[in-house]
A protein has these predicted regions:
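Anion-binding and metal-coordination hotspots
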Residues: 1-294
Length: 294
């Protein structure tokens, strides 16, 4: 897998024999760990929580995680097991900055409407392709005069007169519910504590304990080594608590804390930005073709 050092070095990606190390932290104490060889975090949450449940006999009451875990299957699993979810969505950073635009929405009858408020046609398949899993295809036709075309189709390889969304109404509702949880006072509290506790635990292990590389090979041996590292971290934390040099890390949100609100994206500004991205050469080519056609 590719490591963070490859990305931050700017020297390109190199393949390494590595392990994905997950932690579940509460008030600065490591409650559970999980070691796997998956290259991303999205597929690790369900086996991680399942192993926690098999060990303790219950699931956590609340769960806060970063945007790498915000898939439909993860959200569905969390809500099916009555876990109060504070998992950041995949576009959470863009939502906070106001740069993310919801290209579609569902009404109360589960009808999909695009950004231009046109209702989509639900399809069982599209050009021989069947939707993945529980997803469905939604077709928006006659897009040639849509003013939001540059925003809606900028991720496509070629501009078309139609747009197809592969999505799920259940995922949309779970996503909206999760966003509301994140913006609530409890969500702010959970986000602040996740940044200090989980990232802080990794920081202590890497910096203070000088542990950045496993010494063993094989998933079982590496899991045993990580278990000893987490045990050493908790013992170190316990002695610091007993000596009064540390305290349980948990920030409680004030009673009068108001819910956070997301900034409303400025569509006109984004449209102007997209037009500027075309560059001077693109406009010159267009004018040249227009003159040549005359």
């Amino acid at each position: 897998m590719c490591l963070k050092e490859d990305y931050y070095s700017g020297l390109g990606s190199n393949m390494h024999a590595g392990y994905n190390f997950q932690l579940l932290v509460s008030k600065g104490i490591i409650l559970h760990y999980f070691v796997c060889q998956d290259r991303n975090d999205m597929t690790t949450l369900i086996p991680f929580l399942s192993s926690f449940n098999s060990l303790y006999g219950f699931f956590p009451k609340r769960l806060c995680a970063d945007s790498g875990y915000g898939s439909f299957s993860n959200l569905q699993f969390v809500y099916d097991n009555n876990i109060h979810s504070f998992i950041k969505t995949l576009d959470w950073a863009s939502l906070l900055s106001g740069d993310s635009i919801q290209l579609f929405h569902f009404d109360e009858n589960n009808n999909l409407f695009c950004l231009n408020n046109k209702m989509a046609q639900k399809l069982d398949y599209y050009f021989g392709r069947h939707p993945h899993g529980k997803y469905s295809f939604y077709l928006i036709s006659y897009c040639h005069r849509c003013k939001f075309k540059s925003i809606c189709q900028k991720s496509l390889k070629s501009i078309k007169n139609e747009r197809v969304f592969e999505t799920n109404s259940d995922f949309y509702s779970l996503r909206q519910l999760n966003i509301n949880n994140l913006l609530s006072p409890k969500g702010i509290e959970m986000r602040v504590n996740r940044s200090s506790q989980v990232e802080g635990a990794f920081g202590v292990i890497k910096q203070d304990m000088d542990y950045e590389r496993v010494r063993r090979k094989g998933i079982d041996n590496v899991s045993a080594e990580i278990m000893l590292v987490c045990l050493g971290y908790n013992i170190r934390k316990l002695f610091l608590l007993l000596s009064g040099k540390a305290k349980l890390d948990y920030w409680v949100a004030p009673i009068d804390l108001q819910s956070e609100s997301l900034p409303i994206p400025n569509l006109n500004k984004l449209l102007k930005t997209e037009s500027k991205k075309k560059g001077k050469n693109a406009s010159l080519r267009t004018s040249y073709k227009h003159k040549k056609g005359r």
